[in-house]
Amino acid sequence: MAGVRVKICGLRTESDVKAAASSGAAYVGLVFFPKSPRHLELAQAQRLALAAPPGVAKVALTVDASDETLDAIVEAVPLDMLQLHGGESPERVAEVRARYGLPVMKAVGVADEGDLPQILEQSLAADQILIDAKPPKGAALPGGNGLSFDWRLISGRHWIRPWMLAGGLTAENLAEAVRRTGASQVDVSSGVESAPGVKDPARIAAFLQTAR
């Protein structure tokens, strides 16, 4: 499983960022979604982004955010990528990409084969795709729910953009997830927490050790 790149999402403290970076994370994810226990205010996010060392990409996760909200985030926080994790259309993805001049990763929720065409549709506009478990109906959060999907749905498939696997990943199931899907990039949030929004440095280290 050599060379799997890891994004640790939903970091809330500078020590979280340092734990992720020192263990070898390629990306750190900062969440801007008030319903989430991982939500950050702008000043807090700015401090975290500045704590990330060179070479670690800083990603802002938003959910159906307005231009006004995105303007404020991009102005305040030094970023390398935007992650759109709501119901944004390919047209909206293209608008955001053009407006800010930043790469955009679009999340696509998967529960069954009928969800797979969205991956190609969003790939026409986004720079990367995050393939995540579709949240249950009525769920408050679009991601970070600790749920997996049937990895066989994407086994052996190829898309036109780089992609990242998410959804219920832990140090214990990571090797199996990568073996089944062929993922070269993975995203984890709840799988390295001791409680919602509370990252565990030991779990971060174990996850990244497994990814090496």
Swiss-Prot record:
Q: What pathway annotation does it carry?
A: Amino-acid biosynthesis; L-tryptophan biosynthesis; L-tryptophan from chorismate: step 3/5
Q: Which GO terms describe its molecular function?
A: phosphoribosylanthranilate isomerase activity
Q: Name one Pfam family in it.
A: PRAI
Whichever gene encodes this chain, its name is trpF
Biological process (GO) annotations? L-tryptophan biosynthetic process
Q: How is this protein named in the record?
A: N-(5'-phosphoribosyl)anthranilate isomerase
Give the EC number. 5.3.1.24
Which catalytic reaction applies to this protein? Answer: N-(5-phospho-beta-D-ribosyl)anthranilate = 1-(2-carboxyphenylamino)-1-deoxy-D-ribulose 5-phosphate
Q: Taxonomically, which superkingdom?
A: Bacteria
Report keywords, A-Z: Amino-acid biosynthesis, Aromatic amino acid biosynthesis, Isomerase, Tryptophan biosynthesis
Where is the organism placed in the taxonomic lineage, from the top? Bacteria, Pseudomonadati, Pseudomonadota, Alphaproteobacteria, Rhodobacterales
Q: Which family does it belong to?
A: Belongs to the TrpF family.
